Swiss-Prot record:
Record-linked InterPro entries: Thioredoxin, Thioredoxin-like_sf, Thioredoxin_domain
Family of this protein: Belongs to the thioredoxin family.
SUPFAM superfamilies noted in UniProt: Thioredoxin-like (SSF52833)
Keywords, ordered alphabetically: Disulfide bond, Electron transport, Redox-active center, Transport
Species of the source: Buchnera aphidicola subsp. Schizaphis graminum (strain Sg)
Recorded name of the encoding gene: trxA
The protein's name in its UniProt record: Thioredoxin
Amino acid sequence: MNKIIELTDQNFEKEVLEHKSFVLVDFWAEWCNPCKILAPILEEIAQEYFNKIKVGKLNIEKNPNTAPIYSIRGIPALLLFHGREVLATKVGAISKLQLKDFLDENIK
């Protein structure tokens, strides 16, 4: 079973950019209600896709330096990375089915 990694400005490069496979990053904040709705969906995805992707969450208030690099303007923002490349982006709360479709379209 895969758990969600807590990402920080300090560990982002090691955990995401240097990772050899796909990493789904959720940019979020504690005050964001759509982020709270998305949280349990991400937990399920982390378990169901444990052999395909790594899932991480980056709190943009506690870690203010990383989000501007990727032009994060709205949250929740989901970015799918492969190495240093952003393959796809999805902004806003989405259903589990929409998230699975997003991943299946981009993980090949």
